Amino acid sequence: MDITALSNAAVGSAGVVERIDLPEEISHHLAHLGFLPGTHVEVLRRAPAGDPRVYRIDGIDVGLRNETAQHIFLKITAKDTAQ
């Protein structure tokens, strides 16, 4: 399975959070949004300019800027959840 930064994951793909490489304060905030190692994430859509992007975690849609998402690493489990 591929591991990639969440910001690089294709729209329609899904995976499991492998790790988060951010300062504790930011990681703590992301944990409250559902971004924890082992959590399933779907990449739903991106803004027309590419940033921010919307992800689904436990049935909740969450928007993140790429500058944050580039530090969250995802183990890809599905290339396109629409198929």
Predicted regions and their residues:
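Short alpha-helix capping/helix-loop boundary micro-motifs
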Residues: 2, 25-29
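C-terminal structural segments of small proteins and small subunits
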Residues: 50-83
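Short, structured beta-strand/loop micro-motifs enriched in basic residues and often containing a Trp
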Residues: 13-26, 75
